[in-house]
Amino acid sequence: MVVSVALRDYGPLTVACARTTLGAVALVLLMRVMGRRFPLGDRGLWPYLGAIGLLSTALPFFLLSWGQQYVPSAFAGISMAALPLFVLPLAHVFADEPLTLRRSAGVIVGFVGAAVLIGPGVFAGGGDMAAWGQLACVGAAMSYAVAAILTRRCPPIDPIALSTLTLVVGSVALIPLMLAIEGVPGWAGQTTGLAILF
């Protein structure tokens, strides 16, 4: 809902960038207050941090912001609710977690339930951009699912440090794109300005 309000006056890259950057700043400050250190010397972590940062922050935040220009917030929410349905099959292939008959049945029931919640007419009407918006929201859920699998395979790291560094990676990826495509954002008014801050 807040994203939809922010999109009234800001572009999707700006909204996504605000989410990652403000979150990164807040967590960096929290790390400092708690006296925790970042494992910057562990080179084995950085490929994971880079991939998780892109797939859990930069890409899904942008896809959700872009998609919500054309679809209701409810669709984006339902897409996120379907996240476990993507994680289970991926975990079977990449995380050595067998997809048993019971889990398979759960996935099928989950997909059916999501389809019922979304409704039969969700893909009807709205033009081509609505369909692309729906695909963007589903793509964001899939991106989160892949990031979840990578997080399971990631070497041990402080959870707060992991969250902080992945948001930093997302910010580093999004800021140049935002500046190049949408420019430096300004204060667009109290309603959308506060929405983008939250």
Regions found by a protein language model. Name each.
Residues L27, L90, L99-G121, A140-Y144, ...:
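Hydrophobic transmembrane alpha-helices of multi-pass small-molecule transport proteins
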Residues V15, P159-S163:
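Juxtamembrane helix-start motifs in multi-pass secondary transporters
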